[in-house]
Amino acid sequence: MSWLSNTIQKLCRVTLLSAGSNPLPAISATSTTVRQLSHAERRARGPTVRRYGYKDKIFKSGLLPHLDNGQKLPMPVYRPKNPWSEKRALFGQNDYIDILGNDRLHPVRVMYSVPSWLRGVSGNEYQVLLRKRRLLEKSKYPIARPTKWRDMQKRILYLYKFLNRKTKTGYSKQ
């Protein structure tokens, strides 16, 4: 737009000069004068309102939360834990069974809360699912849970395709 306003100003000057009248000062169409407030005027206006309409939802009355009457909330009463409760006393009981216990007992044999197809498995998701399918296909699992069985089959098929397409294999020994 500046080229348009400059062109109009030039045309006006040319017409005014050719008419013989006094030339008027150039009027800028894009610039407007803004008067800056002095420091005293800004202070007189009061504080600048920022984030209008935002309400702080936190306590602003001190470090600890306060009640409406201004008193601090009391510290909770200290109740020591019972170190000899069953849960705490037996925590980690099988951690060193292979060092301290019988040589013939492997730590995998003491994993009681782990499903049989997952006990002692090391491998990626595809290998774990293949092992699960091999162990569960002869049981009632496919009939009792057909949706989960189908989802597992679909996941195995997807992983098979993905691993064959996207992963590198080593050099062939042939």
Swiss-Prot record:
InterPro entries, sorted: Ribosomal_mL51
First and last residues of the transit peptide: 1-46
Keywords: Mitochondrion, Ribonucleoprotein, Ribosomal protein, Transit peptide
UniProt keyword Ligase, yes or no: no
Keyword Metal-binding in annotation: no
Domain of life: Eukaryota
Example of a GO biological process term: translation
Cellular compartment(s): Mitochondrion
One annotated GO molecular function: structural constituent of ribosome
Gene Ontology cellular component annotations, sorted alphabetically: mitochondrial large ribosomal subunit
Chief location category: mitochondrion
Family of this protein: Belongs to the mitochondrion-specific ribosomal protein mL51 family.
Assembly and oligomerization: Component of the mitochondrial ribosome large subunit (39S) which comprises a 16S rRNA and about 50 distinct proteins.
Protein name: Large ribosomal subunit protein mL51
Record lineage: Eukaryota, Metazoa, Ecdysozoa, Arthropoda, Hexapoda
Gene: mRpL51
